[in-house]
């Protein structure tokens, strides 16, 4: 990897999040986390390809520092593919993410606060990040903000999260009506996975609703609702439980003061 390659594609990466450097490099549609900053204890990365990729991919992937040098042994040697074969999830080596391990003592942490790194395929960067502080707490649903939507519309409901969540976890949130029936619709993540948007298949009806969040929802550092990825042995996490965020759909007229 040479600095020439880094400098030659950074503008494209910043604008599009992917590159098409050469014919042998598989076409990348999206890399998650998709934001510009990730925590130093980042646990996983997902890459969506335009089509299925033949052969092992992990040997072709590297993490590069700003000077072009390669970070040594950052990944767990396992390729986790989606059922359609288009999305590859890569795990950062947990023994180097967690503190107090032999691997971390020998090789050091994978990422350091303040540096910039690039994820590369065949030596060409496909995504850059700035490294921020460790994320040591899971998502806090009490801090989420739910947008207002109007009845008789299919207006998207947007939930602003307190932090980014894992890019593969959009389906870990769902909407139920007052009778507990699941509301059918399409969910997606936006704004660097820090917002969840839901568009119902049928128009909203006025009334009470619940946003149900699975206990296994994670942030990019592997922290879950009410628990941390790195938990002391003498302080095990409590039992996992789904979270509920209540909201209501009302017309503008019913909201107006009397």
Annotate each language-model stretch with its function.
Residues 1, 16, 91-92:
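Detector for methionine-enriched segments
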Residues 22-258:
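Acidic, low-complexity Ser/Thr/Gly/Pro-rich repeat segments typical of extracellular/periplasmic
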Residues 1-10:
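Bacterial N-terminal signal peptides that target proteins for export
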Residues 9-17:
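Bacterial N-terminal signal peptides
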């Amino acid at each position: 990897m040479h600095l020439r390659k880094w400098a030659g594609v950074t503008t494209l990466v910043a604008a599009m999040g992917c590159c098409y450097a050469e014919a042998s490099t598989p076409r990348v549609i999206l890399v998650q986390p998709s934001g510009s900053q990730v925590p130093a204890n980042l646990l996983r990365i997902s890459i969506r390809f335009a089509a299925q990729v033949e052969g092992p991919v992990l040997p072709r992937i590297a993490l590069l520092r700003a000077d072009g040098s390669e970070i040594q042994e950052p990944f767990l040697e396992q390729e986790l593919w989606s059922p359609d074969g288009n999305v590859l999830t890569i795990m950062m080596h947990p023994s180097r993410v967690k503190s107090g391990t032999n691997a971390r003592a020998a090789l050091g942490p994978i990422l350091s606060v303040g540096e910039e790194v690039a994820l590369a395929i065949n030596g060409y960067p496909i995504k850059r990040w700035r490294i921020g502080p460790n994320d040591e707490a899971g998502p806090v649903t009490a801090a989420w903000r739910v947008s207002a939507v109007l009845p008789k519309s299919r207006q998207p409901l947007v939930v602003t999260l307190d932090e980014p969540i894992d890019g593969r976890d959009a389906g870990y949130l769902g909407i139920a009506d007052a009778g507990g029936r699941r509301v059918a619709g399409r969910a997606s993540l936006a704004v660097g996975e820090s917002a969840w948007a839901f568009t119902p298949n049928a128009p909203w009806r006025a009334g009470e609703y619940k946003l149900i969040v699975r206990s296994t929802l994670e942030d990019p550092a592997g922290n879950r609702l009410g628990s941390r990825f790195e938990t002391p042995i003498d302080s095990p996490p409590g039992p996992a439980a789904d979270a509920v965020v209540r909201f209501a759909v009302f017309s503008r007229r019913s909201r107006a003061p009397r």
